Swiss-Prot record:
Function statement: One of the primary rRNA binding proteins. Required for association of the 30S and 50S subunits to form the 70S ribosome, for tRNA binding and peptide bond formation. It has been suggested to have peptidyltransferase activity; this is somewhat controversial. Makes several contacts with the 16S rRNA in the 70S ribosome.
Source taxonomy: Bacteria, Pseudomonadati, Pseudomonadota, Betaproteobacteria, Nitrosomonadales
SUPFAM superfamilies given in the database record: Nucleic acid-binding proteins, Translation proteins SH3-like domain
Gene name as annotated: rplB
GO biological process entries: cytoplasmic translation
Organism domain of life: Bacteria
Protein name as catalogued: Large ribosomal subunit protein uL2
């Protein structure tokens, strides 16, 4: 992969910096692992907006990704690497020895033809999935389960990884990308290495229309709204908010902690640093 700056043939192309990925498959995705996906535009079943700034965008198929890696002991070969419009990471299409094909999140450094395997006896190599009890302390891992057998929930975005700090009894301590240290059961599986497409965060989309293609709608500042729409709204002419920043519903923003899940507080060894948003 490499970053290139395109020629400024128009105002919309002038700021574009894109990731060149010649290793990705140029054809269609593997059809048996596709599902139809309808647009929700951030609405719930009542038609009310539950997530702002969503709507439109190009049609997409959902790729069924294997987050469980439960074909233990059966070797697989990476048939090809593919683009996935639903996530920042790329996908790797695996062909198992029994003929089954599955998508996984493509780890960094794994190329076409690589041999991967999952299970307790798998070698410590990028792309292999093992329980945390069998992974050496200090290893870099991704696609981590929070409950055994539930499937990976942590560290699935492009370029992310987690460090295995220690093991104490039935739990392992992990340092997440945010800086938080969390306890996870040692029977939970994780994949060795870090997620690929690490240059994803360095790209520049270049124009507003390209963001709309991704299903993202504009964000309107509260200070330019009316008082009925936002606490920062109103005033004669161009005025400041006159208060600490708040959300449209009056909750403090810009660093205000909103976590309310007390049930899993005992799984956190230390919170993320205050300056990490």
């Amino acid at each position: 992969m490499a970053l290139i700056k395109v020629k400024p043939t128009s105002p919309g192309r002038r700021s574009v910096v894109k990731v060149v990925t010649p290793e990705l498959h140029k054809g269609k995705p593997y059809a048996p692992l596709l599902e139809k996906q309808s647009k929700k535009a951030g609405r719930n079943n009542n038609g009310h907006i539950t997530t702002r700034h969503q709507g439109g965008g190009h049609k997409q198929h959902y790729r069924i990704v294997d987050f469980r890696r439960n074909k233990d002991g059966i070797p697989a070969k990476v048939e090809r690497l593919e683009y996935d419009p639903n996530r920042s990471a790329h996908l790797a299409l695996l062909v198992y020895a029994d003929g089954e094909r599955r998508y996984i999140i493509a780890p960094r450094g794994v190329s076409v033809g690589a041999q991967l395997v999952s299970g307790s006896d798998a070698p410590i190599r990028a792309g292999n999935a093992l329980p945390l009890r069998n992974i050496p302390v200090g290893s870099t891992i991704h696609c981590i389960e929070l409950q055994p057998g539930k499937g990976a929930q942590v560290a699935r975005s492009a370029g992310t990884s987690v460090q295995l700090l220690a093991r104490e009894g039935s739990y392992a301590q992990l340092r997440l990308r945010s800086g938080e240290v969390r306890r996870v059961h040692v029977d939970c599986k994780a994949t060795i290495g870090e997620v690929g497409n690490e240059e994803h965060s360095l790209r520049s989309i270049g124009k507003a229309g390209a963001v709309r293609w991704r299903g993202v709608r504009p964000t309107v500042r509260g200070v330019v709204m009316n008082p009925v729409d936002h606490p920062h709204g109103g005033g004669e002419g161009k005025t400041a908010a006159g208060m600490n920043p708040v959300s449209p519903w009056g909750l403090p923003t810009k660093g205000y902690r909103t976590r309310s899940n007390k049930r899993t507080d005992n799984m956190r060894v230390s919170r993320r640093p205050a300056n990490k948003r």
